[in-house]
A protein has these predicted regions:
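Surface-exposed, charge/polar-rich loops and edge strands
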Residues: 1-316
């Protein structure tokens, strides 16, 4: 499909720069595809669209302060690393800027020697593999020196990093947040559970696959970057039970959609596994796992807007 089919005008002034005082007071657009109706609500109203027996699936990944600003040891030139994925031990796949100057053997200093990154492999489009050298526990060092990797369309710094996490964030490893979950509060989840709605956690650590721009004219030529996901035995059993009982499976966010669809389409049912996926969902995709989606608005020409377009067209 031509990438321009997913383009639209997005006024910058309509992009919220600050969160609402309360997470669930954000606006909600409820779309019923069976009768083409739209309702303008607040997010706390979402409970009225959920039924007893429904299953909500949420991505419990936690964002790490993955943006590092440092200087090259030899030249003192400034550079930036965005940690995307831990490979093994202290080796990480990173997006770099500027990329051309960071060759194999280059060393970058963050925080006066507290954290050193040495480039050990060059990949395409600004990707590099770095080995990190430090004392202590890596995530604790990262907490001291790293910054939260806010999307480029957010111009203002957050007053607290907790607002760039979901209330159910648990397992550290993401370079971006599963933002559809921002609007849920612990109190709202309690009400949801009291109504007889099941909540199941899965994990997908968000990296380049989710937010990498599409740079090709034909979407079939776009290659998704692999991201690691995990479905536990308990989660797989509960999901399969819900599927057998024909209960609705509702994914919170596109990363939950991709996790569920990647797993179910590969194995024919939900299977407990930890592995990578580069599933790319665009119009024409046959949804097997998910019955409804809770999602934010998305940027033009993004793989995320393609996923939502695929879901809408599949149900029409």
């Amino acid at each position: 499909m031509n990438i321009n089919l997913f383009d639209f005008y997005l006024p910058e002034e309509l992009i919220a720069q600050r969160p609402t005082d309360k997470r669930d007071e954000s606006r909600l657009l409820a779309v019923n595809l069976s009768n083409n109706t739209y309702e303008d609500k607040h997010f706390f109203d979402i409970i009225n669209y959920l039924h007893p027996g429904d299953v909500l699936v949420r991505n419990n990944t936690k964002v790490i302060p993955a943006r590092l600003l440092g200087v090259k040891e030899k030249t003192g030139a400034h550079c930036e690393l965005l940690l995307l994925k831990q490979l093994d031990g202290d080796n990480w796949e990173c997006l770099t800027r500027p990329a051309k100057s960071l060759k194999v053997g280059a060393r970058v200093d963050f925080g006066d020697g507290k954290l050193i990154a040495e480039c050990i492999k060059e990949e395409d489009e600004g990707l590099r593999i770095f080995k990190f050298i430090y004392d202590g526990i890596f995530l604790e060092v990262l907490d001291q020196l790293g910054k939260m990797p806010l999307p480029p369309y957010i111009k203002e710094q957050l007053c607290g990093n907790d607002r760039y996490q979901t209330v159910y964030a648990k397992y550290e490893g993401s370079a971006a947040a599963p933002t559809a979950g921002f609007h849920f509060t612990n109190e709202l989840f309690e009400k949801i559970k009291e109504k007889g709605i099941e909540v199941i956690d899965i994990t997908l650590h968000i990296g380049l696959g989710t937010f990498r721009p599409v740079k090709v004219e034909d979407t079939k030529d776009h290659v998704m970057h692999s991201e690691v996901y995990e479905i536990t035995e308990n989660a797989a059993n509960r999901l399969n039970k819900a599927k057998q009982e024909k209960r609705r499976i509702i994914a919170i966010g596109t990363t939950s959609v991709r996790t569920l669809e990647a797993n179910y389409s590969k194995y024919g049912s939900f299977k407990a596994v930890k592995e990578g996926t580069n599933i790319f969902i665009q119009p024409g995709y046959n949804f097997l796992a998910v019955d409804a989606i809770i999602t934010n608005f998305h940027l033009p020409k993004s793989t995320l807007i393609m996923l939502v377009s695929a879901f809408v067209s599949a149900l029409k």
